């Protein structure tokens, strides 16, 4: 995978607005994220540390490197099969929220927006989205928080209300 990553980075450098987007969490060193699953947390945070390193490494070439992470569980097969079946799926948002947030990040100026750890709904709120009910598996239902979201992550009222 190292060779493949290197080739992809080289292709990015030639693009007019090059981006690398990792799906990795913000680096929050709270002990609660390590308790009971240290190896898993280390693996996730390793991807996040790559964002920091590559953002600095490629900044002078105009290649943006950012991370995107969901605030809540996302209704995927992994969530369905490993985290609690239909009950957790009802407490999740649809994958479209991550796709829409990724689009917003990938269309930003790569020379201006790099080295950021983004939360899906914050990205969309900043882009003007005010109604998040379309992303909920059950509109106005309770949502299950995802792992690794720092306690101090902003939560605008429009996001709370939908």
Describe the function of each predicted region.
Residues 14, 53-63, 109:
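Active-site-adjacent segment of SDR/Rossmann-fold oxidoreductases
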Residues 40-43:
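Active-site helix of classical SDR
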Residues 25-26:
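Residue(s) in the substrate-gating loop at a strand-loop-helix junction
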Residues 1-15:
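Single conserved hydrophobic/aromatic residue that forms the stacking wall/gate
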Residues 19-21, 61-68, 116:
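Rossmann-like NAD(H)/NADP(H) cofactor-binding core
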């Amino acid at each position: 995978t190292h060779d493949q990553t290197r080739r992809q980075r080289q292709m990015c450098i030639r693009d007019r607005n090059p981006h690398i987007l990792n799906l990795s969490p913000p680096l929050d060193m709270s002990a609660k994220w390590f308790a009971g699953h240290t190896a898993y947390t280390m693996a996730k945070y390793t991807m996040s540390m790559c964002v920091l390193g590559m953002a600095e490494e490629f900044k002078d070439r105009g290649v943006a490197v950012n991370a995107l992470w969901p605030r809540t569980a996302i209704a995927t097969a992994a969530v369905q099969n490993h985290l609690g079946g239909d009950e957790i799926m009802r407490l999740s948002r649809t994958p479209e929220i991550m796709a829409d947030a990724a689009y917003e990040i990938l269309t930003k100026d790569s020379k201006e927006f790099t080295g950021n750890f983004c939360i899906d709904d914050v990205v969309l709120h900043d882009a003007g989205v005010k109604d998040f009910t379309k992303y909920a598996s059950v509109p106005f239902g309770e949502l299950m928080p995802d792992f690794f979201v720092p306690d101090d992550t902003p939560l605008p009222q429009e996001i709370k209300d939908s």
